[in-house]
Amino acid sequence: MKHIILYVDLILSWLCLPLMAADKKLKIVPNGPQAKAAIEKEIRFRLNKATGTLTEADLGKVAALDLNRKKISDVGDLKGLKQVKWLWLNSNQIHDISALKELREITSLHLESNQLVDTDGLKELRQLKELSINHNQLRDLSALKDLTQLRYLDLGHNQLTDLSALKDLKLLNHLDLRNNPDLPNAEVSKIRAALPKCRIYSNPTK
């Protein structure tokens, strides 16, 4: 009986491994002191406000932020910046961008070289015209299907296999799909047919 119980426990532990991995993947690591200080410094620079309390009204005046290479892991610290239009978050440690859904005035967003596997959080950003999200691990583009104002989209260096979410983005004039090793040539052909006016860069291997 003891051996049976141990065997059942082992089976259950195997079954739980995918769930544990998923939980680990989805867990958002809070920004450390260095990242928080970098965010505040950039906000103060944009406002020309070196000292004093940063109020909600202050945050509403920020139109652009350059937060490249600031060791940011949690974009939740940006939720108050509801009027920001240009946001650079390249080369950070971000794998969850769901909090960006609050920033609905964004027109240009740069998320290159992070740890993203999906585009959740972008669905509500209907003013977005320029999106650079290359050098991630993207597989799911479903959140992009309603971003019909997009003109420029860089999806290079990801893990894409399905481009169907892009077929109705009729204003796109630049689409970079290079270095997605699992992207079938048939998918690229479908997008070329759906978006005949778009300049598409691709080197499919399948």
Residue ranges of predicted features:
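Low-complexity, polar/charged sequence tracts that form flexible coils or short amphipathic helices
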Residues: L78-G80, L100-E102, L122-E124, L144-D146, ...
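Per-repeat structural element of leucine-rich repeats
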Residues: S73-D74, H95-I97, V117-T119, R139-L141, ...
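N-terminal capping/linker segments that flank leucine-rich repeat
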Residues: K2-W86, A99, G121, K170, ...
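Conserved hydrophobic beta-strand positions in leucine-rich repeat
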Residues: L65, L87-L89, L109-L111, L131-I133, ...
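N-terminal/domain-start segments enriched in small and hydrophobic, helix-friendly residues
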Residues: L155, D162, L166-L177
